[in-house]
Amino acid sequence: MVFSSLFFLYIFLPYCLLLYFLQPRLGGKNAVLIGASLIFYAWGEPVYVFLMLAVAGLNWGFGLLLERKREKWLLAVCVALNLSSLIVFKYAGFLVENINALFKTALAVPQISLPIGISFYTFQALSYSVDVYRKDVAAQRSYAKFLLYVSMFPQLIAGPIVRYVDVAAQIESREFDAESVFRGVTRFCVGLGKKVLLADHVGQVADQLLGGSFVGATTLSMWLGALMFMFQIYFDFSGYSDMAIGLGKILGFRFMENFKLPYTSKSITEFWRRWHISLSSFFRDYVYIPLGGNRKHVYLNLFIVWSLTGLWHGASWNFVLWGLYFFVLLCVERLLKKQLPKIPKIVRHLVTLFLILISWNIFYHEDLSRLLESFRIFFGLSGAGFTNETTNLLLRNNLPLIFVCAVGCSAVPQFTGNVIGLLCAEKADDGVGHKVYAALTFVFDLALLALATISLAGSSYHAFLYFRF
């Protein structure tokens, strides 16, 4: 089940919230949320709900063991068992294919469908076990409460990767107020708008230019396709995170921010402080720092982290290349850290955007031969020409969409919202400002929901990009 479906919006979510808020006690609310989360996950792939239950049970049990007996070998077994499920379900086919290619064998390639969200909930559950071992958090005695942490449907499938330490107190006790619900609804509607009104539409153009045959492709068409995919992946993934955070607010939870205007960055280092924050902080805290961090073997540590980051995104060599591409860029920035601040900010920003654009082209093409050909066209080395009438027409027709996406990636929407809030706050003494702000927000939410509903009713299904990770 996905957030951007009419069934979720008008059947599942309303009934879930109704049952949730009808419960007078927190235990009842937690039970409803667990039940709803299991139904949510099992909707498309019922059998894999048992895998999620097993991963939750594994880490719950190891948490109790590690609290009583903090042995490294116990933690190593826990990590190995968690990673084994990822290897079997996500990487088995990739490993066998490469063994066959390397050793000229003919082993049968496993055809295992990827459980949705396995990378997210496995990392989330594993972080709990490591935190218990480190004494950062007390082990949870109740399997039901731990299952709620792992399976909570707002962030189950595509994050943010929530740390147990951040929600442990909220599982035991949380407050509900109208303002939080109000803000949660707005955040959810913003995310829905990002996904349905922007990501899905630019994604169609990106697939048209990058996903089909390269016959007739031009340099400009490849640049336009990469730009559209750059917009798509941001609005798709940040839109999901907005919806997850919004639903969390409605239910009384506070999830971490996962995106902070990443395309406003002036360096790749800054970009990764703003993009998919829950993943980058996971690798920082559970891989980079334990390896030695900035204290020793810095570049080796970065190499390991970015190789793993690439593999986390998918079992394909292009994802490994994507991770290593960022490894190289981050190393270069470390080496030039004294010189880079001397370059004008606008130049650094434009160079950063160009480098990010290149990265998304690597990310998009899982077939390495197509990736190579795309870059030949991208840099005008294929003899295909700079543009043609088809590309020009596509560009002209999508200029308004490109403009809206560019503004949406900037600080303009946030700044505008803050200004409106401040103007309304000036009238807060007599209560008028608050009412005006509430009315404007309500109209804004309703408009986004209506437009998204119309779009969903007239279009085919578009899954979130990060569901496959």
Indicate residue ranges for each PLM-predicted region.
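Membrane-embedded transmembrane alpha-helical bundles that form the catalytic cores
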Residues: 1-468
